[in-house]
């Protein structure tokens, strides 16, 4: 490959299908303040396949939804009596989400509790007194949404996740890893016994590898029950670190004999500095973390998203959900002036790709000591349309980037759009000369392009 060519696309080499299930989010149109801010159409435009329900009470203030303690507030009561559940707010939230085009990925348990680092000051992350009783409560929730129980629904909710980040500390689980492993197995066995067709797993670890992870998987192996999926998280500014997480999880699962257990990375986000997103951070650290091109939800973050999503298409990863928690704020898609941020447009870019195209084609990226180019080529199901998505992460200095293309001789370019520090999916010029495609950069920072073609009639 010529030294000035960043990657080569071969549209004659179909390498399989795109996986749209990797394009999910932890957010949805909000239920609180819905009369003031209806965001259904904006979320539809992102084409997320899944919406994971973790932390939803935190950005729907005043609403008792999703978390077990909101749906079943008095844990000593009978979990087989429908009168002891409060489903109404969750019913509405799930309806809104599904009508916005997303499937539900339901996290059972509690949202994170940031009020203290002391176990005796927590309320919702305490270890349940009776694991079997708690499992019956969770069975009631699943039954309501999948079997129509308690004036419920027959939704096709496939994924049910047990807990979230238990090894993080008391803000998520106040017990030991041994207690959690026993709790996880108890709930897993109870739910699979009544609902064999759903997928039950978890527990949304902060990383795929570690002592807690081994303890939970060993407990499952000892109990002779495999989780249907294994979920974990990652926050970083290194695309390659996040792209290889599924491989690490896959190898761990296989080592325990869980070769059929799926892998899910269902919280992930660009992270410059954890301290800079807290209210106690010095102002200069907040500015470094949040503002400018390298900011938390700005162009570096947006192109990072695309680099990861492109890279994952060749990894052993069944599902993923971006953290995206609520539409506004530090982890959202809008800034304090309600302008859609760069991450919103990056998710829209990838959503358009996986919703309109089916097949992925061969791409050979030029080796580089520090990889900054991530690229994917795609074809529609009928092969009448083609697309190229390019992410230039952390910005090559070149004013232009060139790519070799093969197999598009009978296609014409119908649209090209750029996402960079100043433009949000704006139309742009591309130069196609023979079998070479060249795109221009407006500045040396991160940028991404979505270029679409249609077959000449």
Task: Give the predicted meaning of each segment.
Residues 1-48:
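Mature N-terminal, pre-catalytic/accessory segment of carbohydrate-active enzymes
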Residues 5-12, 34-39, 88-92, 145-148, ...:
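Alpha-helical scaffolding within the catalytic cores
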Residues 25, 97, 141, 160, ...:
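Conserved, mostly hydrophobic/aromatic
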Residues 46-239:
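Substrate-binding cleft and catalytic face of glycoside hydrolase catalytic domains
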Residues 177-305, 315:
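Noncatalytic carbohydrate-binding groove/subsite architecture in carbohydrate-active enzymes
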Residues 270-375, 382-384:
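Aromatic/acidic polysaccharide-binding cleft in carbohydrate-active enzymes
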Residues 368-410, 416, 421, 446-452:
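Carbohydrate-binding surface patches
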Residues 431-457:
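C-terminal beta-strand-rich structural cap/linker in extracellular carbohydrate-active enzymes
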């Amino acid at each position: 490959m010529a030294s000035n060519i960043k990657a080569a696309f071969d549209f004659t080499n179909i390498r399989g299908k795109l996986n749209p299930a990797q394009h999910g989010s932890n957010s949805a149109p909000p239920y609180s303040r819905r009369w003031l801010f209806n965001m259904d159409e904006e979320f539809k435009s992102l084409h997320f396949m899944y919406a994971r329900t973790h932390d939803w009470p935190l950005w729907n203030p005043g609403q008792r939804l999703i978390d077990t303690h909101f749906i079943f507030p008095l844990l000593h009561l009978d979990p087989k009596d429908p009168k002891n559940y409060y489903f109404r707010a969750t019913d509405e939230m799930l309806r809104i989400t599904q009508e916005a085009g997303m499937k539900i990925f339901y996290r059972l348990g509690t949202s994170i509790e940031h009020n203290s680092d002391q176990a005796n000051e927590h309320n919702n992350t305490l270890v349940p007194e009776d694991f079997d009783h708690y499992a019956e409560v969770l069975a009631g929730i699943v039954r309501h949404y999948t079997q129509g129980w308690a004036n419920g629904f027959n939704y096709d909710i496939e994924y049910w996740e047990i807990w979230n980040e238990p090894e993080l500390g008391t803000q998520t689980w106040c017990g030991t890893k041994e207690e959690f492993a026993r709790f996880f197995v108890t709930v897993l066995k109870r739910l699979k016994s009544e609902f064999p067709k759903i997928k039950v797993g978890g527990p949304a670890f902060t990383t795929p590898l570690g002592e807690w992870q081994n303890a939970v998987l060993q407990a499952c192996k000892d109990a002779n029950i495999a989780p249907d999926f294994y979920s974990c998280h990652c926050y970083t500014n290194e695309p390659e670190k996040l792209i290889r997480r599924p491989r690490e999880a896959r190898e761990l699962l296989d080592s325990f004999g869980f070769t059929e257990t799926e892998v899910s990375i269902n919280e992930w986000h660009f992270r410059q500095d954890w301290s800079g997103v807290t209210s106690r951070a010095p102002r200069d650290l907040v500015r470094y973390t949040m503002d400018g091109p390298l900011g938390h939800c700005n162009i570096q973050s947006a192109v990072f998203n695309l680099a990861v999503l492109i890279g994952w298409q060749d990894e052993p990863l069944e599902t993923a959900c971006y953290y995206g928690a609520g539409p506004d704020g530090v982890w959202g898609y809008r800034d304090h002036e309600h302008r859609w941020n760069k991450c919103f447009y990056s998710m829209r870019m990838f959503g358009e790709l996986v919703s309109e195209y089916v097949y992925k084609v061969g791409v050979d990226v030029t080796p580089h000591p520090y990889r900054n180019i991530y690229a994917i080529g795609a074809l529609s199901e009928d092969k009448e349309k083609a697309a190229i998505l390019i992410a230039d992460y952390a910005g090559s200095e070149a004013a232009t980037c060139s790519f070799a293309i093969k197999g598009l001789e009978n296609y014409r370019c119908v649209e090209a759009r750029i996402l960079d520090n100043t433009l949000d999916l704006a139309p742009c010029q591309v130069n196609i000369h023979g079998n070479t495609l060249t795109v221009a950069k407006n500045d040396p920072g991160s940028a991404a392009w979505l270029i679409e073609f249609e077959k000449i009639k």
